[in-house]
């Protein structure tokens, strides 16, 4: 009995060689449509066009090709049901043994900057998903392939099984098929929700693996890196120029570093941030990038060992030389100058990456909890002082405003309870992750030491009591920036006035857990 294969693909990678082997090695008869049939015929492979197979022409400009009983009957027929076989015979329908379908490139289409809604709509596949789902449903009786990477394993299984495909193989292909259509529909729903400015009580998440990581946060935890969308973006689009394979912890720290450097546009002062365990240990700005890095390093040279460095400008030779003076895990910047690349290459295990757009972060963040997950808008608004309020008698100078803004940008990216002490565009002390705010204040001030005299202090949350203000003043802090919003704000304001401090309320809290 002849075997029939239905081929209709958008991704034509490996198509001709695969189809030729089906025909020459395994005596398949191929039914195909549109561009797939055209390519196979041009390659000299015998093909029956879908219109010939069904006896019905393509209509509506190709919108209706495969939606026909002779196609779907051949896919959905159960070989072990007499009534199904009788229906096939009565309607002269040939059952398919193999269906090879992948879908219109919707995600690649919407990734184009100039795409219109009409363009996107035309790339919503109808017949393809119908064939994929029907084939996956009936995997007990046929095989569905949705990715060119499956072609060689299928041919191997066919040869090893003397023409029979094992059920386990068909099951895996069916699962991949349903994942394929689910991801496709999720991409469409997400895009249309954005276009229609609509909200929904359902959330579709779709992702594909980029890399299986060596392990997660700890060696006993398995981990995989996924990207959203068919087109690589964010870290999936970054270029790793050298060094060891990225780890789970590297990626987590790199993302935190990206978020900090996104606060400092490349057309402003040079900026450098050094992170350890998802927290900044040194952040600095300067005219020269090498100076910004050195100041960030000197801010906490002990913690910088084994750290992650993010820079807002192309790495030059001077900065590269400075960074080779200590052990670092990763460096990321918009680009690397050739002379700098030669210098960094001496550190073979050092991971060096370029990321074209530091503002390419997600619009929402997702966190797993038992039985589900939480979704929130990303805290990625660029900070300005426009809506800030001076709440003390003492007023900030023009220079103070710049330093208050710098400190506020930094503390936003420190784990709560978060305190940052800064001066002249450099962090002097950072208190992170303490269970009480005054505890973080004390840690930051202890790190700053004598340098706290005349410095700025930023807090990611309000002060519940005036103890933090008094502790800061005793160390020499001259200005504080915080969200405000405590029931006891008046106590903190009174303490600041009593001690001659400037205090500014931003009106925005930046908890980070």
UniProtKB/Swiss-Prot annotation:
It catalyses: (6R)-10-formyltetrahydrofolate + 5-amino-1-(5-phospho-beta-D-ribosyl)imidazole-4-carboxamide = 5-formamido-1-(5-phospho-D-ribosyl)imidazole-4-carboxamide + (6S)-5,6,7,8-tetrahydrofolate; IMP + H2O = 5-formamido-1-(5-phospho-D-ribosyl)imidazole-4-carboxamide. Residues 1-146 form the MGS-like domain. It comes from the Bacteria. Pfam families: AICARFT_IMPCHas, MGS. One of its GO terms (biological process) is 'de novo' IMP biosynthetic process. GO terms for molecular function: IMP cyclohydrolase activity; phosphoribosylaminoimidazolecarboxamide formyltransferase activity. Keywords: Hydrolase, Multifunctional enzyme, Purine biosynthesis, Transferase. GO terms for cellular component: cytosol. The keyword Hydrolase applies. This is Bifunctional purine biosynthesis protein PurH. It comes from Synechococcus elongatus (strain ATCC 33912 / PCC 7942 / FACHB-805) (Anacystis nidulans R2). The gene is purH.
């Amino acid at each position: 009995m002849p075997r029939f294969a239905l081929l209709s693909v958008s991704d034509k990678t490996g198509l001709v060689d695969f189809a030729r082997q089906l025909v020459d090695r395994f005596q398949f008869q191929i039914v195909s449509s549109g561009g797939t049939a055209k390519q196979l015929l041009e390659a000299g492979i015998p093909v029956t066009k879908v219109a010939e197979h069904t006896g019905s022409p393509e209509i509506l400009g190709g919108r209706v090709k495969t939606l026909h009983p002779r196609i779907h009957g051949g896919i959905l027929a159960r070989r072990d049901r007499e009534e199904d076989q009788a229906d096939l015979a009565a309607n002269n329908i040939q059952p398919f043994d193999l269906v090879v379908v992948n879908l219109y490139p919707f995600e690649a289409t919407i990734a184009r900057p100039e795409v219109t809604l009409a363009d996107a709509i035309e790339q919503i596949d109808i017949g393809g998903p119908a064939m994929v789902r029907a084939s996956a449903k009936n995997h007990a009786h046929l095989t569905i392939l949705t990715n060119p990477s499956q072609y060689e394993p299928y041919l191997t299984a066919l040869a090893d099984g003397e023409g029979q495909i094992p059920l386990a193989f068909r099951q895996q292909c069916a699962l991949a098929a349903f994942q394929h259509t689910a991801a496709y529909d999720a991409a469409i729903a997400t895009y249309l929700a954005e276009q229609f400015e609509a909200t929904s009580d359902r959330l579709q998440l779709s992702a594909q693996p980029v890399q299986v990581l060596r392990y997660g946060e700890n060696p006993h935890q398995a981990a995989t890196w996924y990207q959203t969308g068919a087109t690589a973006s964010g870290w999936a689009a970054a270029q790793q120029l050298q060094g060891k394979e990225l780890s789970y912890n590297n990626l987590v720290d790199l993302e935190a570093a990206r978020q900090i450097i996104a606060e400092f546009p490349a057309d402003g002062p040079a900026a450098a941030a050094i992170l350890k365990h998802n927290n900044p240990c040194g952040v600095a700005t300067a005219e020269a990038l090498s100076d910004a890095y050195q100041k960030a390093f000197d801010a906490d040279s002990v913690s910088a060992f084994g750290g992650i460095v993010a820079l807002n400008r192309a790495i030059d030779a001077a900065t590269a030389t400075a960074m080779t003076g200590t052990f670092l895990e990763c460096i990321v910047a918009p680009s690397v100058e050739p002379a700098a690349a030669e210098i960094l290459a001496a550190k073979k295990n050092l991971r060096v990456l370029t990321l074209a757009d530091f503002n390419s972060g997600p619009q929402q963040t997702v966190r797993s909890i038992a039985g589900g997950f939480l979704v929130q808008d990303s805290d990625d608004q660029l900070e300005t002082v426009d809506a800030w309020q001076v709440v003390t008698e003492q007023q900030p100078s023009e220079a103070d405003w710049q330093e208050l803004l710098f400190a506020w940008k930094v503390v936003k990216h420190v784990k709560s309870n978060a305190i940052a002490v800064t001066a002249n565009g450099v962090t002097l002390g950072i208190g992170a992750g303490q269970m009480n705010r005054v505890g973080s204040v004390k840690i930051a001030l202890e790190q700053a030491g004598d340098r706290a005299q005349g410095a700025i202090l930023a807090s990611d949350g309000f002060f519940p009591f005036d103890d933090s203000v008094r502790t800061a003043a005793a160390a020499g802090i001259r200005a504080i920036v915080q969200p405000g919003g405590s029931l006891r704000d008046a106590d903190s304001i009174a303490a600041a006035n009593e001690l001659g401090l400037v205090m500014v309320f931003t009106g925005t809290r930046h908890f980070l857990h």
